[in-house]
C-alpha cells in the first residue's frame, strides 16, 4: 500500500514537473522568437534611416541626417526592468542644416513595430509610457511600422507621426483615437506615410 502511494506521488510529481517545464519552455521559445523578429526589424530601421555611423555626423555625405543618441535594449527578467525600458526604441539628433522642419540639435524619438500582417493598433500602456517619456526636450515621436518580411527586409514600411494615430493631452494624460474610424479607413488614411524608398526611411524634410 505504501509503495503504491509512493509511486502515485512520484507519477504526480513528474507529471507536474513535465507540465511546468513544457509550459516554461514554450514561453521562453515564443519570447525568444518574438524578440528576434523585433530586434531584426530595429536593426533594419537603423541601417536604413540616414544615421551616421559610430554616432558622428559625416557632413560630407548629404544623405546623413541623424546622429543616433540612444538605442534602447529590452532587458528584463521576472519583473525586473530598467526605467529605460519605458522609452521608445531609438533617440536621434538632427545633424543637417538642409531640413525645413528640423534644426540642428532637434531630437526625435522612434518606436519600431514589426508585424506579420498590416495593422496599426497600439497598446494603451505602451502609448502612456512613450508619451510620459516625451515630456523631455524631444521634438517629435514617430512610429515605424514594418509589415511582413521578404529577403533581407520588410515587405512594406510606414513612418507615421504619433499625432496621426492619436491625440495625447499632457495635462490629463488622456489618449484620444480618431472617432468611429474603421481599420480599413485608418489604412487608407495612413497610406501617404508608406515609404516608397526603404533606403532612406527617416529622411524627414
Q: Residue ranges of each PLM-predicted region?
A:
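Acidic-basic catalytic patches of nuclease active cores, encompassing PD-(D/E)XK
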Residues: 2-83
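Conserved catalytic cores of phosphodiester-cleaving nucleases, focusing on short active-site segments
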Residues: 49, 90-94, 100-116
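Short, solvent-exposed loop/turn segments that connect beta-strands within catalytic domains
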Residues: 57-62, 96-105, 150-154
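Short loop/turn segments at strand-loop or loop-helix junctions that form parts
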Residues: 67-73, 111-114, 146-148
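Beta-rich catalytic cores
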Residues: 86
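Mg2+/Mn2+-dependent nuclease catalytic core
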Residues: 115-137
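Nucleic-acid nuclease catalytic cores
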Residues: 134-167
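Intrinsically disordered, low-complexity terminal regions enriched in charged/polar residues
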Residues: 158-205
Amino acid at each position: 500500500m505504501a509503495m503504491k502511494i509512493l509511486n502515485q506521488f512520484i507519477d504526480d510529481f513528474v507529471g507536474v514537473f513535465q507540465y511546468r517545464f513544457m509550459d516554461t519552455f514554450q514561453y521562453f521559445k515564443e519570447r525568444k522568437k518574438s524578440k528576434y523578429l523585433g530586434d531584426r526589424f530595429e536593426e533594419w530601421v537603423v541601417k536604413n534611416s540616414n544615421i551616421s555611423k559610430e554616432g558622428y555626423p559625416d557632413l560630407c555625405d548629404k544623405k546623413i541626417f541623424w546622429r543616433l543618441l540612444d538605442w534602447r535594449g529590452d532587458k528584463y527578467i521576472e519583473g525586473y526592468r530598467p526605467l529605460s525600458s519605458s522609452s521608445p526604441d531609438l533617440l536621434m539628433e538632427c545633424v543637417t542644416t538642409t531640413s525645413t522642419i528640423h534644426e540642428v540639435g532637434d531630437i526625435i524619438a522612434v518606436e519600431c513595430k514589426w508585424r506579420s500582417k498590416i495593422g496599426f493598433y497600439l497598446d494603451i500602456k505602451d502609448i502612456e509610457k512613450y508619451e510620459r517619456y516625451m515630456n523631455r526636450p524631444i521634438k517629435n515621436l514617430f512610429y515605424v511600422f514594418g509589415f511582413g518580411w521578404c529577403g533581407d527586409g520588410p515587405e512594406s514600411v510606414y513612418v507615421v507621426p504619433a499625432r496621426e494615430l492619436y491625440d495625447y493631452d499632457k495635462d490629463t494624460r488622456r489618449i484620444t483615437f480618431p472617432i468611429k474610424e474603421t481599420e480599413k479607413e485608418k489604412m487608407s488614411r495612413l497610406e501617404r506615410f508608406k515609404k516608397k524608398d526603404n533606403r532612406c526611411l527617416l529622411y524627414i524634410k
